[in-house]
From Swiss-Prot:
Binding site residues for a peptide: 139-141, 271-276
Superkingdom: Eukaryota
Cofactor(s) required, per the database record: Zn(2+)
SUPFAM superfamilies: ARM repeat (SSF48371), Leukotriene A4 hydrolase N-terminal domain (SSF63737), Metalloproteases ('zincins'), catalytic domain (SSF55486)
Annotated compartments: Cytoplasm; Nucleus
GO MF, one annotated term: metallopeptidase activity
BP term (GO), one: protein catabolic process
Catalytic reaction annotation: an epoxide + H2O = an ethanediol
Lineage start: Eukaryota, Fungi, Dikarya, Ascomycota, Pezizomycotina
GO cellular component: cytosol; fungal-type vacuole lumen; multivesicular body; nucleus; NVT complex
Protein name: Leucine aminopeptidase 2
């Protein structure tokens, strides 16, 4: 009988997932706030994908304490293999007997996290909004689940999950909550919280949070969860659009499969805009801008319920399949279906600016500017940028324009049905779209003429589409007027920006920021005063105005910049602010980072250290 060989597709895991596949995990954890640890056990059900040839199960771990391993209820021998940076320490579990193809075994691992865990952030009461209780949350993407529990930490493996979590404070997890009164142990003051995830998910979507959390309805299948003192304002921000977004995307793809769609608004040190943890999107409080202008983050994370969470990139080298598709769907939903087609183009223009910024950061010939990256031996976090989002979006938009929007609309549900519950790479995507359109001679001809290799492997910017600029022309004109000063007769008035959306003001500030013409410090200060920019509740606006001011050498933005850096941990804002601050006043940049580094999430802290010091500080 021939040996079964299943080549692994993911270079960022040390597990032998080509021989064993985890099909269900039960996670039993006690949240120990005093020790800043999770302690408990995880039970994997593994299916053999060989004919008894593999007698070892190798799992990813990173800085974990293992208490013991049982296989089918019996103690089993195990060992740590040599550590390999940046992937951690493989855990090798020995099996006493062969397991035939498609047979399953149960592996129970006793585990405690350590202070070196990269997936968890522990906040003191002082770091929360109402300053009453400690708080913890996880961020497992891309390869941080392995620092919570031993697993096959790859998006190429998906399994169902049960969570049994004990905590003195309310718990959120990436499963459907069992909505009954949690059982409380009177002696310890802790309660058991249970969640079930019946849709198979990859390890990076394992999520936990616990703290002083309350919930309020934002739709017929949705709640927002956050600190009690912020609950009303978060509810107001999200209740008008959440169900509208779900309905819009269901029309484009197919019905939502996860049961509930909820949003957890985290404390301000959360490093991303949002994380698409199933059933509970984790989101930054920076979207709560009191004007409902920043909730495109919710449209984006909701779109992940189809692209990414149901249909997943097989490895982080093909990350554009998650993020390019999600950005495409987000713009079809929050922009085209809610605001109209010109708004989709307006968002794409904002995205193009983010794309060029990322290209400039890496260098236009860098490997990380390709659609398909080479991550062998690399940390996927180092490649994280807007490139997979925006270059991916532009590729899909290009394909849409080639075949026509209505035909592309027929392809969308076909694609998401074909790979529902599966992981795929770029080559399978290419084969699928070519196959779908092969009977349509016109579309097939156009797709066969696409330079696929150039799109997949060429570094740098793709061709720029011919976007509808109607919503940006007015702010381009306003930027030109400012850049004509002091040599023109333009007199800035508050009326200049009346009627503009916050996102239009963002584009205005970006135009000023990228111009080779530099504002004087006096003009920068005037802009802030006349338009009220430094005082804006909308952090997208306030952060860009601070960058404009620093570029102009305007000392008046120094304190607002430092204040912003002390109250938000979202990398989208923190990293550019530090990069600009160090050019403006390196000493203050370093002092500010030293003051606030414990406020930032470990992922954010490591990235800013690289930005400021060139490499991670020891």
């Amino acid at each position: 009988m021939a040996t079964v060989i299943n080549p692994p597709r993911d270079p960022n895991t040390l597990s032998n997932y080509n021989n064993w596949v985890s099909i269900h995990i039960t996670a039993n954890f006690d949240i120990l706030f005093d020790q800043k640890k999770l302690a408990g056990n995880v039970v994997h059900r593994f299916r053999s994908t060989t004919r008894g040839e593999s007698r070892d199960i190798i799992l990813d771990t990173n800085h974990l304490d293992i208490g013991g391993v049982k296989v089918n209820g019996q103690p089993s021998s195990w060992e740590f293999l040599p550590r390999l940076e940046p992937y951690g320490t493989p855990l090798k579990i020995k099996l006493d007997q062969a397991v035939e193809l498609d047979e399953t075994i149960e592996v129970d691992i006793s585990v405690t996290t350590t202070e070196k865990c990269t997936a968890l952030q522990w906040l003191t009461p002082a770091q929360t909004s109402n300053k009453k209780h400690p708080y913890m949350f996880s961020q497992c993407q891309a390869i941080h689940a392995r620092s919570i529990f031993p697993c096959q930490d790859t998006p190429d493996v998906k399994c169902t999950l049960d969570f049994n979590i004990t905590s003195p404070l309310p718990v959120i997890a990436s499963g459907l909550p069992v909505r009954k009164q949690p059982e409380t142990s009177k002696s310890e003051g802790k309660s058991l919280y249970q969640f079930h995830q019946k849709v198979p998910i990859p390890s990076y979507l394992f999520a936990l949070a616990s703290g002083d959390i309350s919930e309020a309805s934002i739709g017929p299948r949705s709640v927002v969860a956050t600190s009690p003192d912020k609950l009303r304002e978060c509810q107001w921000e999200l209740e008008a659009d959440t169900e509208k977004f779900i309905n819009a995307i269901e029309k484009i793809v197919y019905p939502y499969v996860w049961g509930e769609y909820n949003v957890l608004i985290l404390p301000p040190s959360f490093p991303y805009g949002g994380m698409e943890n199933p059933i509970f999107t984790f989101a930054t409080p920076s979207i709560i801008s009191k004007d409902r202008e920043n909730i495109d983050v919710i449209a984006h994370e909701l779109a992940h319920s189809w692209s990414g969470n149901l249909v997943t990139n097989a490895s982080w080298e093909h990350f554009w399949l998650n993020e390019g598709w999600t950005t495409y769907l987000e713009r079809r939903v929050s922009d085209a279906s809610v605001h109209g087609e010109p708004y989709r183009h307006f968002s794409a223009i904002i995205g193009w600016k983010a794309l060029t910024d990322s290209m400039d950061h890496f260098g236009h010939d860098h490997d990380f500017t390709k659609l398909i990256t080479n991550l062998k031996g690399k940390d996927p976090d180092d490649a994280f940028s807007s490139i997979p989002y925006e270059k991916g979006f532009n590729f899909l938009y290009y394909l849409e324009t080639l075949v026509g929007k209505s035909k592309f609309d027929d392809f969308i549900p076909h694609y998401f049905n074909k790979f529902k519950g599966k992981s795929l790479d770029s080559y399978e995507f290419k084969a699928t779209i070519l196959d779908f359109f092969q009977a349509d001679s016109e579309a097939a001809k156009a797709l066969n003429e696409v330079d696929w290799d150039k799109w997949f492997y060429a570094p740098g910017l793709p061709p720029k589409p011919d976007f509808d600029t109607s919503l940006v022309d007015v702010v381009y004109d306003l930027a030109k007027k400012w850049l004509s000063l002091p040599g023109s007769s333009f007199k800035p008035q508050p009326n200049d920006i009346r009627g503009l959306s916050a996102n239009q003001i963002v584009v205005f500030l970006e135009q000023v920021l990228v111009s080779e013409h530099q504002l004087t410090p006096e003009l920068s200060r005037l802009m802030g005063e006349v338009y009220g920019l430094a005082r804006s509740n909308n952090i997208e606006v306030a952060n860009l105005y601070c960058q404009v001011g620093m570029k102009a050498g305007d000392e008046s933005v120094l304190e607002p910049t430092i204040e912003l850096l002390g109250k938000i941990g979202r990398m989208k804002f923190v990293r550019p602010l530090y990069r600009n601050l160090q050019k403006f006043n390196r000493q203050r940049a370093i002092e500010t980072f030293q003051e606030y580094k414990d406020f930032y999430h470990p992922i954010c802290r490591a990235m800013v250290e690289k930005d400021l010091f060139g490499k991670k500080e020891e």
